[in-house]
Amino acid sequence: MNELIKMVGIDYTEQRKKFPDFKAGDTINVHIKISEGKKERIQQFQGVVIQRRNPNTNGETFTVRKISEGIGVERIFPLLSPTIEKIELKQQGLVRRARLFYLQGKQGKAARIKAKITSKA
């Protein structure tokens, strides 16, 4: 029983370090391992981060939204999931909210997010 408590209490900072820092409004590309029968392949899911839930805990999740053939698709990923191969930060967004649920009712130009401009100095 004591060993189980130690395993649950493990801090996963090493596993967190392999992912970039991202927040709501950022455009990311998530590489996920998909196993179909005996085959295993990597599928990419690119979209805007709508929210991060339970930050800095072992149960942290993040929601990514994309538009596929005119239909909005949202997917929730656990940050410490073994199926996530890597996360690429494509673009940083400039937003004032931590949860961007207002994007669910918008399409096209109305759903755009301003890009954060970083200087290369």
Swiss-Prot record:
Q: Provide a GO biological process annotation.
A: translation
Keywords for this protein:
Ribonucleoprotein, Ribosomal protein
Q: Looking at the Swiss-Prot or TrEMBL record, what is one Pfam family this protein matches? A: Ribosomal_L19
Annotated disulfide bonds = none
An example of a GO molecular function for this protein is: structural constituent of ribosome
| The keyword Transport is annotated on this UniProt entry | no
SUPFAM superfamilies xrefs? Translation proteins SH3-like domain
Tell me which Gene3D superfamilies the record gives. Answer: 2.30.30.790
Q: Which GO terms describe its cellular component?
A: cytosolic large ribosomal subunit
Q: Does the keyword Coiled coil apply?
A: no
Which HAMAP family does its entry note? Ribosomal_bL19
Q: Which family does it belong to?
A: Belongs to the bacterial ribosomal protein bL19 family.
So what does this one do?
A: This protein is located at the 30S-50S ribosomal subunit interface and may play a role in the structure and function of the aminoacyl-tRNA binding site.
Q: What is this protein called?
A: Large ribosomal subunit protein bL19
Q: Which organism is it from?
A: Amoebophilus asiaticus (strain 5a2)
